[in-house]
Curated annotation (Swiss-Prot):
Mn(2+) 1 binds at D346, G347. Disruption phenotype: No visible phenotype under normal growth conditions, but mutant seedlings show increased sensitivity of roots to salt stress. It is a single-pass type I membrane protein. It comes from Arabidopsis thaliana (Mouse-ear cress). This is Protein phosphatase 2C 70. Residues 304-577 form the PPM-type phosphatase domain. It catalyses: O-phospho-L-seryl-[protein] + H2O = L-seryl-[protein] + phosphate; O-phospho-L-threonyl-[protein] + H2O = L-threonyl-[protein] + phosphate. Its main location: membrane.
């Protein structure tokens, strides 16, 4: 009985030891070491010797330095603008963020230095232990983990070139120079000679509005032009100027092709059309506008200019007056970049002679000043009398076809010396006049050539051909000096094309309140030079510091002539030498 009890106790002790051993075995899990050994053996079979010798990051500091200096040399351009937006955001949307630090000046890397930090939100299923992750080159990535054979440098040049090309592709792009100058000139119609220039970056002056009523940048006094006819905008996406018809009644053409809405007269806008240099815009049937486009500011005028004109129709008992005035200005003249021309012509017997003269005068003057000797003579002597006299003679010689048509001509020549001071000299035929305000007083730059004027009566008397009592016209013409009128000039020697030429005026840079007013007799018949100057001074004070004040002043003088009930065509050029306003 005792033996049976001892056997039971022994068996119980063995079971307890076995249970304790099992508990220890399960707690320690020794089988996991066998699993790791098998896995490690399998992984190690996929390694190559070259992979064990290849580091995760190149330890050649010169490589990274060379790449950085190359990018700087390619893209550090003076005056260049860069687009930086969007380079980082594209990486974030792909679930990857890359951060790159510039390498130190030392070719060796110190401990703790950070080169590339990579965070990957999408783990690779095929990645093996110790293997370098190769990420595909993606647009917008700022850095990439590299593999580099440091043992024999066999791939150094290839890797360098590939990385350089990749960095160049990923670097910020140079933004194209968006500056573009638009120049418009009316070459046909009642407002012939009117000009306007604008820069694509002058957002406050855009769009350019073409129409008959204010506020139009190109104010066209043509009954066929709608109040708001068309406008020109700068398309910053295409880098192009675009013209759109604003629902005009008589339509808009570009190079004889309509750009208006198909339902003409519906007041619906047309589609935008790209403009190119040398295009011709036709508004209605008579007004034509020449287009020039340049990437450089070749149209900049060193003073402010305002132009205004009105045929003053319905002033004579309800009879419509044809527009025979033409005005024109050009700065600089071709081949004479320090010279500019301002001209008003008033036709009689028709507008043909005036329109011919306004085209011939700038051409002849530019040809004369293209002679370097004559140009230098003007600059050195500060006097252009010979040039102006020659210009009128050559213009008159080219008007042979105008036997019964003539026109006045008032030409203001402005030039700049090497010290940036201006000079102004005027020549005229007829009764269109020019006045300049300088030094607190106004200066008459022209002479009145009407038959009844004192200067002409004196000239007749000196030639022994005095006027008879009560005689105020010759061959029905109230002018004694003009361009054209070839037949009357052949019949009466008192007619002349010899211009009056003023003394040159010097306008220093420091001069203030300097301006000129050129106008046809529609203004001067009802507004004296003194009153015109007073009106300008008042308007200058009111408009001081505002944009387009020159245009407003020109229109202000025109409104004064209208209020004074002028009965003749009126054209005005206002020239302000004080650009600080």
């Amino acid at each position: 009985m005792a033996m049976i009890g001892m056997n039971i106790i022994g068996l119980f002790m063995v079971l307890m030891l076995l249970l304790i051993s099992l508990i220890i075995l399960f707690a320690c899990k020794p089988w996991r070491y066998f699993s790791r050994f098998r896995s490690s053996s399998r992984f190690s079979s996929t390694f190559k010797v070259g992979d064990l010798q290849r580091p995760l990051i190149s330890d050649d500091g010169n490589l990274i330095q060379g790449q950085t200096s190359e990018v700087t040399r390619e893209y550090d351009l003076e005056g260049a603008c860069y687009q930086n937006d969007g380079l980082l955001h594209s990486s974030l949307t792909e679930g990857r963020f890359y951060k790159q630090r510039l390498p130190s000046s030392s070719p060796h890397f110190s401990q703790g230095e950070s080169f590339v930090l990579e965070v990957i939100s999408e783990p690779s299923d095929n990645a093996l232990v110790g293997q370098t992750l190769k990420l595909p080159a993606e647009k917008g990535s700022l850095a990439e983990v590299q593999t580099y054979d440091w043992q024999n440098n066999r791939n150094e040049n290839l890797q360098y070139n590939l990385e350089k090309d990749r960095l160049i592709n990923l670097s910020p792009r140079l933004v194209e120079d968006q500056r573009s100058w638009l120049f418009l000139e009316v070459i046909a119609g009642p407002a012939i000679g009117l000009q306007h220039a604008v820069n694509s970056t002058s957002s406050s002056k855009l769009p350019v509005k073409l129409g008959r009523v204010s506020p139009s940048d190109l104010a066209l006094k043509d009954s066929e032009v709608s109040g708001k006819h068309a406008q020109i905008t700068w398309n910053s996406t295409k880098f192009k100027w675009e013209l759109v018809d604003m629902g005009s009644l008589n339509g808009t053409l570009v190079n004889s092709h309509s750009i208006s809405h198909p339902d003409l007269g519906s007041r619906k806008w047309g589609n935008p059309v790209e403009l190119a240099s040398d295009d011709i815009i036709t508004l209605g049937t008579t007004t034509k506008v020449y287009v020039r486009i340049s990437s450089q500011n070749e149209f900049q005028i060193p003073f402010k200019i305002g132009v205004a004109s009105d045929p003053m129709a319905m002033r004579r008992g309800g009879r419509k007056l044809p527009m025979e005035d033409v005005c024109h200005y050009k700065w600089p003249l071709p081949g004479a970049n320090k010279f500019g021309l301002f001209c008003v012509c008033d036709g009689h017997g028709g507008s043909g002679a005036a329109q011919s003269a306004i085209k011939i005068i700038p051409e002849v003057l530019a040809n004369i000043l293209s002679d370097s000797l004559r140009k230098e003579k003007v600059l050195s002597k500060r006097d252009a009398s010979d040039v102006l006299r020659d210009m009128f003679a050559k213009t008159e010689a080219r008007l042979e076809e105008h036997q019964y048509e003539g026109c006045t001509a008032t030409v203001l020549l402005v030039w700049k010396d090497n010290e940036e001071n201006f000079f102004a000299q005027c020549a005229n035929l007829g009764d269109s006049a020019c006045v300049i305000h300088l030094g607190g007083r106004y200066i008459q730059m022209t002479e009145d050539h009407r038959v009844v004027s004192l200067s002409e009566r004196k000239r007749f008397q000196e030639a022994g051909l005095a006027l008879r009592d009560g005689e105020t016209r010759l061959f029905g013409i109230n002018l004694a000096r003009m361009l054209g009128d070839k037949f009357p000039k052949q019949q009466d020697s008192r007619f002349s094309a010899e211009p009056y030429i003023s003394e040159p005026l010097r306008i220093d840079q420091s001069s203030k309140d300097v301006f000129a007013v050129l106008a046809s007799d529609g203004l001067w018949d009802v507004v004296s030079p003194k009153k015109a100057v007073q009106l300008v001074l008042q308007m200058r004070d009111k408009e001081r510091g505002r944009e387009s004040s020159a245009e407003k002043i020109a229109n202000g003088l025109l409104n004064e002539a209208r209020a004074m009930r002028t009965k003749d065509n009126t054209s005005i050029i206002y020239l302000d030498f004080d650009t600080s306003l």
